[in-house]
Each structure stands twice: as C-alpha cells, then as structure tokens.
C-alpha cells in the first residue's frame, strides 16, 4: 500500500451544498456544476428493491459471509443499517449493489461455461460524483466499503473498455490503525489484477460519528474526497464504461488468504471467521444516511431547480 500525504498538501476543495429540505447536505467538488441524477435517502419502511440487490455468491459459489435476501438490513425511517449477524460460530452481513458481475452469479450449469444467468442491473452510470454519508461499525473483524464495479472488469487487457474497481472508501485499517483506504484496482481478480496506488488517511468523523466519502470520476481520472477534503488522486487507467454502485459489509476470515483474487474460492473452500468477530457486542452495524450520484454539467448550462418531495422522516 502506498501512503500519500495529501491532507497537508491539498486544500479543502468541496462546497457544502443543500440538496433537499430536511436532509443532510452534500459536499460537492468546487469549480464545477453538478446535477443530481440518482440517489437513495433511505427514508422508507423497506429497502427499495428497484435500486438495490444483494450480492450472495462469490466465484459462483454460495459465500458464507454474505447475508441473503436482505437479511440484516434495517430501515430506521431515516437511514439504513447493515447489521453484523452471528449464526452459531459463523458470521455474515449484507452486501448491497445496484448491478452485478460474473463472480457474484451462482453457477447454474455443469458445462464448460463457468457463469450463471446474468442479472439485469438496476443502476449503471459513467463518470460523475459518487457520495455517501455513513457511520462506521464499532467493532473490528468485519469491514464496510463504498465502491464501484463494472460487469466486465478484467475481461479485456484494456481497463478503459472493461472497467475499473474504484474503492471510494474501505475501513479495513480503521480499528487497528485509525486509517481509511481508497484507490483503484483493475485487470480482474486473478494473476493479471493490479492494485498499486491505493492510499490511506486518518479516520475522522463528526461529533455524532457521521462521515462523508466521495469520488469525482471523469475522463481525466479519479479524485477522492473525505469530509470535504481532497485526499487523493488516481489518474490512470480510467474506465470509460458504465459501472454499478456497491454499499457493502463483509465478515473477515472467509476468504482465507485475504484478497487473493478469488483463488481460494476456486478451490471451493472457505476460511474461518476472524477471531475478533467473537468479541463484537451486537447489535453492530454500518449505517448509511444517503447515497447520491451527480453528473457534471457544462458551466454555461443553466440548471433548473426542481423541488423533489420525499415522505416525512419517521420518528
């Protein structure tokens, strides 16, 4: 992992922007005009299944760390909570996404083709600003993430035409080192995968525990932000294809050798839960206030203000 001291050398370059009445503001990159194109404020009584699906499989096999059928998803009327669940001596948690790719599809044939039937994506998008407001879990042994993937990532030697994994936020190192991680990976998840360039910064939250994370993805590259501050860039390669959004959690240990490109899954064996999971006091959860996606619009375009009505927050 590459440590980059961006906080000291880069100014605060985001502007606090009120988007909706009675909702938390966004922090948008300065110097550009933005238009909201997709969002979930998580105000309903149930998760919006027109926007989110669950990842339940890993490399064609049922993965014990992924909860099924939105189990562990709690709607508070203001936020969504993704809970860590204990089942005997095993643990799992929800993994939400707006699309799908080959390795999270159960294999449904005994023939040579290693993939099952593709799932229709619920939301795919190219370029723009992707933002989350969230509270991190209290206990170690599992992690949260906000990221982007493409259905064809790694399927072509040229990442620009098949997609890049963009990790906008991962809290792998929060509890042990006080760090949050971001950066890109490409080339798939096997021997061609490339992961250099990830960077970390000090974990910070407001007095109530809320954090903002985002990425400005453009044809020129990726600029990462946390809590109104620009914290890093990664400018090559750049995906020029539509990708889907993930808000995920995962109990550690089941991948055996960490992020090994799925090779342990290829052997159809899983590891055992991280011992730290047994120290967690439940309930523990990753809480999300909103996910928003914005498009950059040309400076000479005049935006019309549309008042969007939402159901009142539940008390």
State where each predicted segment sits.
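GH16 jelly-roll
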Residues: 2-315
